[in-house]
């Protein structure tokens, strides 16, 4: 049952075949057995069992709260949760307990969701591997799949403490790992430049970044206010659509959310692509793109065309400038947002108290890692009086040009864009950490950050396995607030790929995980 989709599990609960407490206990057991993956920072066992028991009572009375009632979920540890520690994987917030729930968290609780725990991430969401956390890196569960183990150059099977495991992606790596490993049916991540879609692609799950303003950011500890958006990680596109319907809508606590009411939708079972135009951006043939991703991208475009969709090459001419533009704007907002962590009101406070200035400096030196401090320094540099026009203002203008590129393409009749999500499959951890964080992020975010700067919806769908037996994802980008159309196309492609999730098998020992995949989800 742990390999089911959210909607399948919900149906089993409604039929009374399994009780929410039984399902909760199964997930908690699996979390403990796969603890070496380091997906969770905090496991909320007592809270989960209490919430599941309450769901038991509602089902016994025939009054479930909704489709999420009794369903195990996980929340990225940069969302505020009342009474539960929210650390952002940083010493700066270790021990911090928020007095309120983030809006998305509260909406899930209102639907009866059962919280398994808070998931691991790069410190404050600044990274693309989930390797820069004070709680240690997240391991991709596919590191322990038969498909990967059998393709390794070494002959022996992996142990939990070996060095051959691959990264989960980031910064929402813990959330992607939790869903992929079967410890929950839904995880919430955040997406500033690809932080939901990148790990979803590497872990073989669906990752949805909604249109900016469609889902409330209230309670999401901010990184880049103008780009941050809660992300949804599930095992299938239908589940992502279901959850979006629960989370979307105006929030009085977030003035950037749209005023118009959101109409939840379900995706059709029979999908007709004959009236759709799919765009293939030529600028996304980026340096470093693996031949496997390129082949998968091309094959998927052919499948869409054979199904009746019009497929055409399009141009987004300012794409080559986007990653530099993103870096300038991202670090500038980071510098502003991180100023609130000064040791005065909450979070870590240094013992050095010779003066307020000394305490403030020591607190930030002790509380932030090198990556966070580096981004703060970069952002403050771009915001200096002598640099403001030269860098920050110019980057804002380029951002507008990037957004206009998308507007022109969509106004030309294109409905959805098909692109890679990442340059390749997940890198081995020891190889990944050889590069500095900024270089890694530039490489990993190259296909994803444009949609954050343009505020557009995007979803990554698992599309196949690499020659190393690791997941490869493809990204679909839609028009603003056209999530239904976007997810309909994504669901059609998902059906063609028939990608199967990982299934945990205790018989193999060492926390091994085996993959049961169908013929169409084989190696590219």
Curated annotation (Swiss-Prot):
GO annotation (BP), single: glutaminyl-tRNAGln biosynthesis via transamidation
Function: Allows the formation of correctly charged Gln-tRNA(Gln) through the transamidation of misacylated Glu-tRNA(Gln) in the mitochondria. The reaction takes place in the presence of glutamine and ATP through an activated gamma-phospho-Glu-tRNA(Gln).
Active site location: 76, 171, 195
Organism of this sequence: Xenopus laevis (African clawed frog)
Pfam families recorded: Amidase
GO cellular component terms, A-Z: glutamyl-tRNA(Gln) amidotransferase complex; mitochondrion
Enzyme kind, highest EC tier: ligase
Main location: mitochondrion
Compartments it resides in: Mitochondrion
Single annotated GO MF: glutaminyl-tRNA synthase (glutamine-hydrolyzing) activity
Protein name: Glutamyl-tRNA(Gln) amidotransferase subunit A, mitochondrial
Keywords: ATP-binding, Ligase, Mitochondrion, Nucleotide-binding, Protein biosynthesis
Lineage: Eukaryota, Metazoa, Chordata, Craniata, Vertebrata
Catalytic activity: L-glutamyl-tRNA(Gln) + L-glutamine + ATP + H2O = L-glutaminyl-tRNA(Gln) + L-glutamate + ADP + phosphate + H(+)
């Amino acid at each position: 049952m742990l390999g089911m989709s959210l909607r399948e599990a919900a149906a089993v609960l409604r039929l009374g075949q399994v009780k929410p407490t039984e399902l909760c206990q199964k997930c908690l057991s699996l979390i403990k057995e796969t603890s070496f993956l380091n997906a969770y920072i905090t496991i909320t066992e007592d809270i989960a069992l209490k919430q599941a028991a309450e769901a038991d009572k509602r089902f016994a009375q025939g009054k479930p709260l909704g489709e999420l009632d009794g369903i195990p979920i996980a929340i990225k540890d940069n969302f505020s949760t009342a009474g539960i520690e929210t650390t952002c994987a940083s010493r700066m917030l270790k021990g911090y307990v928020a007095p309120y729930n983030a809006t998305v968290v509260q909406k899930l609780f209102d639907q009866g969701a059962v919280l398994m725990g808070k998931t691991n991430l790069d410190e404050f969401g600044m990274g693309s591997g989930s390797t820069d956390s004070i709680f240690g890196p997240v391991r991709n569960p596919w590191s322990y799949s038969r498909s990967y183990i059998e393709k390794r150059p070494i002959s022996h099977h992996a142990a939990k403490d070996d060095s051959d495991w691959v990264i989960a992606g980031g910064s929402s790596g813990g959330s992607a790992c939790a869903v992929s490993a079967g410890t929950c049916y839904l995880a919430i991540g955040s997406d500033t430049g690809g932080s939901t879609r990148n790990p979803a692609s590497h872990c073989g799950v669906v990752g949805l970044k909604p249109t900016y303003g469609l889902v409330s950011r209230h309670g999401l500890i901010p990184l880049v206010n103008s780009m941050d958006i809660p992300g949804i990680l599930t095992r299938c596109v239908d589940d992502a659509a279901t959850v979006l319907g629960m989370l979307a809508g105006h929030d009085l606590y977030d003035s950037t959310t749209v005023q118009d009411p959101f109409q939840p939708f379900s995706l059709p079972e029979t999908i007709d692509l004959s009236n759709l135009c799919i765009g293939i951006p030529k600028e996304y043939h980026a340096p470093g793109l693996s031949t496997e991703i390129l082949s998968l991208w091309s094959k998927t475009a052919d499948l869409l065309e054979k199904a009746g969709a019009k497929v055409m090459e399009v141009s987004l001419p300012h794409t080559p400038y986007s990653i530099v533009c993103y870096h300038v704007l991202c670090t500038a907002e980071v510098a502003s947002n991180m100023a609130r962590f000064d040791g005065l009101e909450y979070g870590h406070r240094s013992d050095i108290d010779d003066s307020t200035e000394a305490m403030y400096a020591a607190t930030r030196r002790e509380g932030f890692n090198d990556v966070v401090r580096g981004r703060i320094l970069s952002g403050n540099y771009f915001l200096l009086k002598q640099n403001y026009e030269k860098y920050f203002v110019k980057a804002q203008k380029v951002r507008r040009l990037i957004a206009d590129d998308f507007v022109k393409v969509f106004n030309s009749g294109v409905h959805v864009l098909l692109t890679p999500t990442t340059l390749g499959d997940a890198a081995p951890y020891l190889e990944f950490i050889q590069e500095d964080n900024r270089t890694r992020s530039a490489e990993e975010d190259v296909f994803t950050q444009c949609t954050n700067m343009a505020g557009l919806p995007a979803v990554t769908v698992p599309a196949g396995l690499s020659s190393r037996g690791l997941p490869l994802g493809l990204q679909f980008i839609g028009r603003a607030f056209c999530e239904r159309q976007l997810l309909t196309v994504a669901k059609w492609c998902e059906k063609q790929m028939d990608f199967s999730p990982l299934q945990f098998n205790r018989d193999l020992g060492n926390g091994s995980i085996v993959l049961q995949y169908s013929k169409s989800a084989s190696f590219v």
